[in-house]
Amino acid sequence: MSNSQANAGSSGSADEPTLNPSGSATLVPNLTTTNASSQATPASTIPQQQQPQQSQPQPQPQPPPHIVGASTADAGGGVGVVVAGGSEGVNLDSSPRESGDDSEDESEILEESPCGRWLKRREEVDQRDVPGIDCVHLAMDTEEGVEVVWNEVQYANMQELKSQEEKMRQVFDNLLQLDHQNIVKFHRYWTDTQQAERPRVIFITEYMSSGSLKQFLKRTKRNAKRLPLESWRRWCTQILSALSYLHSCTPPIIHGNLTCDSIFIQHNGLVKIGSVVPDAVHYSVRRQWDRESAREQERERGAHYFQAPEYGAAEQLTAALDIYAFGMCALEMAALEIQPSNSESTAINEETIQRTICSLESDLQRDLIEKCLNPQPQGRPSANDLLFHPLLFEVHSLKLLTAHCLVFSPANRTMFSETAFDGLMQRYYQPDVIMAQLMSGGQERQYRLADVAGADKLEKFVEDVKYGVYPLITYNGKKPPNFRSRAASPERADSVKSATPEPVDTESRRIVNMMCSVKIKEDSNDIIMTILLRMDDKMNRQLTCQVNENDTAADLTSELVRLGFVHLDDQDKIEVLLEETLKAGVMSDGAGAESSGAGVTTTATMAALEQLERNWSISDADKTMGSSMSSPATAMMYVPQDQQQYQQQQQEADVDQSGTTSN
């Protein structure tokens, strides 16, 4: 199955998307995303490069700095970025760059992250007055070769940063754990205190190159097209699915800045919300602006951001604030534009809102929006309740349920590798494949795939389900994380190590394939075990540790689960693999050639856990599995049973075919 359509931000073409009957846009950018991180080093700033004189001729104009994505490291989700804004794409209405000099100026590297992975560029991102975010630039992910967004929150002084640092870190650490297909991803954050008079919090978010929903609605209105009700329903369902996920977190996360400018639509109809401004960031992290300038800014933003009546007066934001904002977004999506009653004013008042609601043709559409815009916060429904509104609720078809079972079932994600899954699709996704045989009146009738209407779009449908275009709203959605009361700093260790080890996050990904080998070091006769895991998000994880003859497979597996290296449900099959490896390797004195591990390139390495009696070395990568295991005498490989049956059937079919040919 093709992986060219990923629900992630990256560089790509800035062509204008157009609406098709299915509610999708036809823009097809190259998309990649990553969830790998690197160990931090002290922050540093790259000096600006000297620009060439204008009088010197350029040998060849440079193309616009749109970097085509490399390999896909995380196709499903990764920890989210819903957080604090700045994930928006460059304004698609702006004119293209006219010369190579302009391209070089915007591609100039201004700064790098402490870990050296992200490079801040001069090119700014149109972030549309996201409150609390002072500076937004495009940046390059040097490990994945894709564009990301560099966001900065500036403090008035060092004292203000220190007073809010603990709360800020707690908020951002929680946001790092978010994982939802309709939420823009959040990659990393750190603090910069090198300049005491200008301390900053910097965070990296996913770059959405396809543009915002606001831009899409403007182009749709310019082309004199009405948004189909089915597209409106699909977009509302995806937005509410993301809000329900945020509000179900413990503690709940309030978006605080939901508008059509902070909602992004991709080429396949996938909708993502970004520019999250949690209450801790909005009220505590941002600079202490002058009251007059703050009020002026609120008046200016009133023309673009539709906030609940209680916004600003409440001491603490609630989920009802996001529901009101969603109602305004739903109204704008249905009407394509909310025009002020007075041509001389850009403010949106109650009269304008009611006139726009009355212009809608669907009674159910008006009812849903009016419930969201209830002036009383306690009278507004929750995001989960809105998913069961008569206009949005539907009994899912067997086709959709089957696709979700095929794509998201833990058993299928574990038992089928991507190669085996693609092989099955190629084998059974053919027009002449017999889907059913019915006996009627003593006669047999066969139904083939070609007889089913729309079967030619089945592969695309399964792919859209995988990327979150068709969520299941009648069942419990993805369970959000329960945040810890305190999280460790991502960029610096505590100066005094606690006697109690920090809690370790559990692994949520499942294992698709795994290999294990043991070898004896020639200089010390130490037994080294290496485990290579293929996760369901296409990432590889390599684990290495020293073992002895007293170690058992059960003890080793329990330790892997306790440290959060593997999923609890994968414990049994890992234990079987380790037991077979120890029997073949340790008990036979480690016979066999030594595994060299050549060809493996890691993208992140975690420090060994010193407080444990055994030190595990772990590295994550997105390369192929087989390159690090070169010794068949000491390596064991786990092959799912269904994949074994499929391979056996393929071999038998090949034998039958060769026998028929020879005859």
Curated annotation (Swiss-Prot):
Q: Name one Pfam family in it.
A: PK_Tyr_Ser-Thr
Q: Which residues belong to any copy of the Protein kinase domain?
A: 122-392
GO molecular-function annotation terms?
Answer: ATP binding; protein homodimerization activity; protein kinase activity
Q: Which UniProt keywords apply?
A: Cytoplasm, Phosphoprotein
Q: Where is the composition biased (Polar residues)?
A: 19-46
Entry's localization field: Cytoplasm, Cell cortex
Please give the GO cellular component terms listed in this UniProt entry. Answer: cell cortex; endomembrane system
Sites where Phosphothreonine occurs are at 500
Has the keyword Transmembrane been applied to this entry?
no
Regarding protein family, the annotation reads: Belongs to the protein kinase superfamily. Ser/Thr protein kinase family.
Protein name stated in the entry: Nuclear receptor-binding protein homolog
